[in-house]
């Protein structure tokens, strides 16, 4: 939708003005915006991107990532890590918001459990017949 392209562009420009950790914003068309960050900052979760915006920051350890994860983060996608290692990372750092750890490309796959909730249980009704 054209409005999404415009909102994505405006959001990228607004973030470039507000936050000093943006190194570059690259896009060849309106489908994908790549925003390179120098580091995370305390309001990183407010610097979100939508509709095809990818933010990239290089970190030395996953512990740096744990500093910005809050209850708004529900799914951790991965490439190049074992599930067990990431499970330990989430548990050891007490990352309460993370309730799904899935490979990249599977983040939108829906199962019976979604974002920590039993979908069937929440959308079903039990009728007792006596």
Each PLM stretch: what is its role?
Residues 1-77, 85-96, 101-121, 126:
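NAD(P)-dependent aldehyde/semialdehyde dehydrogenase
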Residues 80:
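Short beta-strand/turn micro-motifs composed of small residues
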């Amino acid at each position: 939708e054209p409005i999404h392209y415009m909102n994505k562009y405006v959001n990228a420009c607004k973030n470039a003005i507000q936050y000093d950790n943006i190194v570059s914003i690259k896009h060849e068309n309106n489908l994908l915006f790549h925003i390179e960050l120098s580091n995370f900052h305390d309001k990183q979760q407010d610097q979100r991107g939508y509709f095809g915006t990818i933010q990239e920051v290089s970190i030395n350890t996953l512990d740096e990532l744990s500093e910005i994860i809050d209850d708004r983060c529900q799914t951790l996608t991965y490439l190049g890590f074992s599930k067990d290692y990431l499970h330990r990372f989430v548990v050891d750092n007490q990352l309460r918001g993370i309730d799904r750890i899935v490979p990249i490309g599977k983040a939108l796959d829906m199962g019976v459990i979604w974002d920590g909730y039993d979908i069937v249980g929440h959308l079903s009704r039990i009728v007792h017949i006596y």
